[in-house]
Amino acid sequence: MFAHGYGCDQNMWRAVVPSFEDEYRVVLFDYVGSGLSDLSSFNRTRYSSLTGYAADVIEIIEELGLDRVTFIGHSVSSMIGALAAIERPKLFEQIVMIGPSPSYINDGDYVGGFGRSDIEDLLEMLDNNHAGWSAMMAPIIMGNPDRPELAAELEASFCKTDPVHAQHFARVTFLSDNRSDLVKLHTRTLILQCAEDAIAPLSVGQYVHRCLPESQLIVMDATGHCPHLSSPGPVTDAIRAFI
């Protein structure tokens, strides 16, 4: 099961998925408010925290009659998958986290990468200028400035997301703090961390690894927050070796 990150959709996995289709049953989906999802299904109360999105993951697994799922989550989906596995551990065989962050906000000795005021400023800009926010953030998130087409694709993905849902999901994503949940996760986990990532720095990947005794950390020689787009080969190889 492949789960996309904020502002994206299932199409973002297109360079990775073909390597698994012959051997595994592959499940792709869009979270409510993303991609081609049914926007009428959005419930502000249900999706006021990441647990609502985790409940959707569990519902999909149950509806399809799956078990022993390998959950591969990018960015915020890493924590969504963790919450789902904590709630229903028997459904999950293993988890792959790509660029995970349990909290984006610095707190004492914990370095999440952003000050609270930084996050508040980003959210305010998103509220006031969705297109401008997308144009500013896409190159930062994607990295790889020598390949501007990658940032352009991410910007287009941000821009086609419904602004109301984008603003809501951004708040839930960037203001969540799931550090205390990590110790509850006992599912075998692979953490794929880019050596340079402006959104989830190396220190965060190392923190997640320390908190998860059943985890393996691979620091890839890659930049940016979306290696499944910028470096799909190494991502695919790491996942295959793990599962």
Question: What are the functions of these language-model segments?
Answer:
Residues 1-5, 193:
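The conserved beta1-alpha1 loop
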Residues 18, 28-76, 237:
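Active-site loop/oxyanion-hole signature of alpha/beta-hydrolase fold enzymes
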Residues 198-204:
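Conserved alpha/beta-hydrolase "acid-adjacent" motif
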Residues 185, 191-193, 197:
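Short beta-strand/loop motif that positions the catalytic acidic residue
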Residues 82-87, 91-128:
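Flexible "cap/lid" loop of the alpha/beta hydrolase fold
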Residues 5-8, 75:
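Active-site glycine-rich loops that stabilize anionic/oxyanionic intermediates
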Residues 214-243:
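Catalytic active-site module of serine/aspartate enzymes centered on a nucleophile-bearing elbow/loop
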Residues 106, 110-114, 124-184:
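Conserved alpha/beta-hydrolase catalytic His-Asp/Glu region
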